[in-house]
């Protein structure tokens, strides 16, 4: 019998659905207690109270500096907070991500929280792979986890099923509060791909449910029209374990590029650790740095 380390966390039909549609919804990935543990770490981080003393890679929506309805986003939280690192660096999530992509291992790519207060503006439609073209191969998969009731009214994630198959281009752009229609990049891509009427699917997700997104799937989010509800989510992205850097000057990825090693295209595991691998390997320092919040007991 295969061990928990090698056994696929998905059925062949589930993997086939993901490969066909570019997404897969998993119910009850997180418990209510786990969700509370995650959310209670957000306010200290946005108040620049970093447990490890290390700043995140990127953040938007700072108290006292940004508009009250600004979408708050933070990237690289695992470097700041070990509680959140238990989720961002989870081998269980990396295993699930890698299984859907057909990889034999996965390493940390990005960990991002999205917090949309009432009347928060739209997030422009985009493809995640567009932002990792400094990596070879420029492919990632994202586990997007609802931490609150994500509905059309609260500006939930919107996806276009099957759009990861489109033959179209995309470009790096600022995603927050677009001046034009937030769907404009999608319409342009659909026209280029010969898709007359792309289907936009708003995902209704209760807290704890997750959707796995192919890196080429078009997605964005509408305005939070609720007067009282804040929409929260956690997006955990995985790169293939064998990934390297593209030659310097190739592709986009300003966050990734700051962690390059001089004279090498290898990705340093100190900054982008391997979280799960088919042969059981996991970057050694993780055992001392944080617990795996979703570790499965047994073998």
What positions do the PLM features span?
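Short, structured patches in soluble enzyme cores that scaffold and shape functional sites
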Residues: 112, 127-129, 145-149, 161
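Short, conserved beta-strand element in jelly-roll/cupin
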Residues: 134-152, 204-205, 212, 236-241
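Short, surface-exposed loop/helix-turn segments at secondary-structure junctions
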Residues: 126-128, 185-197, 228-231, 249-257
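Non-heme Fe(II)/2-oxoglutarate
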Residues: 48, 56, 65, 210-212, ...
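A short beta-loop-beta micro-motif enriched in histidine and acidic residues
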Residues: 128-140, 198-199, 205, 229-230
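Double-stranded beta-helix
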Residues: 150-218
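Non-heme Fe(II)-dependent double-stranded beta-helix
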Residues: 1-20, 27-125, 131-134
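Phosphate/oxyanion-binding loops and surfaces in catalytic or ligand/nucleic-acid-binding neighborhoods
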Residues: 45-48, 103, 150, 166, ...
């Amino acid at each position: 019998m295969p061990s928990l380390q090698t056994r696929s966390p998905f059925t062949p039909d589930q993997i086939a659905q993901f490969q066909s549609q570019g997404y897969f919804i998993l119910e009850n990935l997180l418990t209510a207690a786990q969700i509370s543990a995650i959310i209670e770490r957000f306010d200290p981080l946005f108040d620049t109270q970093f447990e490890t003393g290390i700043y995140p890679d990127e953040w938007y929506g700072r108290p006292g500096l940004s508009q009250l309805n600004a979408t708050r986003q933070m990237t690289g939280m695992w470097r700041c907070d070990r509680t959140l690192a238990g989720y961002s660096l989870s081998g269980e999530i990396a295993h699930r991500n890698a299984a859907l992509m057909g990889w034999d291992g996965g390493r940390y790519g990005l960990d991002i929280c999205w917090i949309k207060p009432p009347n928060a503006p739209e997030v422009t439609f985009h493809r995640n792979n567009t932002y990792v073209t400094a990596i070879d191969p420029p492919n990632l998969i994202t586990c997007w986890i609802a931490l609150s009731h994500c509905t059309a009214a609260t500006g939930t994630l919107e996806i276009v099923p099957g759009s990861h198959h489109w033959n179209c281009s995309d470009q790096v752009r600022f995603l927050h509060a677009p001046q034009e229609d937030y769907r404009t990049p999608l319409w342009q891509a659909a026209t280029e791909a010969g898709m007359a009427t792309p289907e936009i699917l708003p995902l209704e997700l209760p807290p704890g449910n997750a959707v796995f997104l192919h890196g080429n799937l078009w997605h964005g989010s509408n305005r939070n029209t609720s007067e009282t509800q804040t929409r929260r989510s956690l997006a955990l992205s995985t790169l293939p374990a064998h990934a390297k850097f593209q030659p310097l000057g190739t592709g986009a990825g300003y966050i990734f590029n700051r962690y390059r090693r001089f004279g090498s295209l290898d990705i340093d595991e100190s900054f982008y650790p391997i979280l799960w691998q088919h042969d059981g390997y996991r970057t050694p320092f993780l055992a001392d740095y944080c617990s795996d919040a979703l570790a499965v007991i047994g073998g």
